[in-house]
């Protein structure tokens, strides 16, 4: 993990980053000292293999067609000085590139206290792994292994009045 000094030791933090694999949340949590409450699509809670893991780490379930309760939970967590992680693309990448960001985090920030620090991050070197949505043709070119070098880069913080284009640019600058 590079840029760990950019993650505040205390206070509310909204971590926003790219979503390149199904295990991004675990990689980031293992590499950072603070507990991160990730926002996860409700479909994953319905899968037995993920359900117990997501409950154990205190992930927040979100259903896009009924996101109001999840939004209120996220705002409450931030107001309680927690770290909340969101993948604002809203899906695991199917191309390896950063997609357009959804608006949800802007709404969360508008309803949270002003002291929320927005911290961009990027997960690098997971595209083409077993855990990515890369096509089989790309996965075949990479030797299968559960061990691989992964780089997580944590960027400099942004203010709570940031917007999608600033966040996307910040995340994009951390990708390589």
Describe the predicted segments one by one.
Residues 18, 41, 89, 121-123:
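Cofactor-binding loop segments of dinucleotide-utilizing enzymes, especially the Rossmann-like FAD-
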Residues 1-11:
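A short, well-structured juxtamembrane/interface segment
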Residues 97-164:
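A cross-family acyltransferase "interaction/gating" segment
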Residues 59-84:
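Helix-adjacent hinge/juxtasegments
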Residues 9-66:
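Catalytic core of membrane glycerolipid acyltransferases/transacylases, capturing the structured
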């Amino acid at each position: 993990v590079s840029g760990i000094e950019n993650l505040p030791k205390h206070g509310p933090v909204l971590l926003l980053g790219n979503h390149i694999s199904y295990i991004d949340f675990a990689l980031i949590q293992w590499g950072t000292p603070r507990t991160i409450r990730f926002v996860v699509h409700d479909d994953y809670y319905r899968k037995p293999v993920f359900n117990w893991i997501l409950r154990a780490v205190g992930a927040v379930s979100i259903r896009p067609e009924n996101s109001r309760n999840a939004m209120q939970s996220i705002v409450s967590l931030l107001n309680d000085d927690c770290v909340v992680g969101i993948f604002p693309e809203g899906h695991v990448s199917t191309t390896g590139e950063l997609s357009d960001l959804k608006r949800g985090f802007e709404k969360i920030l508008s309803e949270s206290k002003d002291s929320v620090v927005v911290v961009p991050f990027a997960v690098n070197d997971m595209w083409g792994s077993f855990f990515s949505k890369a096509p089989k043709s790309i996965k075949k070119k990479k030797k299968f292994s559960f061990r691989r070098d992964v780089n997580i880069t944590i960027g400099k913080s942004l203010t709570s009045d940031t917007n999608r284009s600033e966040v996307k640019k910040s995340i994009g600058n951390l990708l390589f």
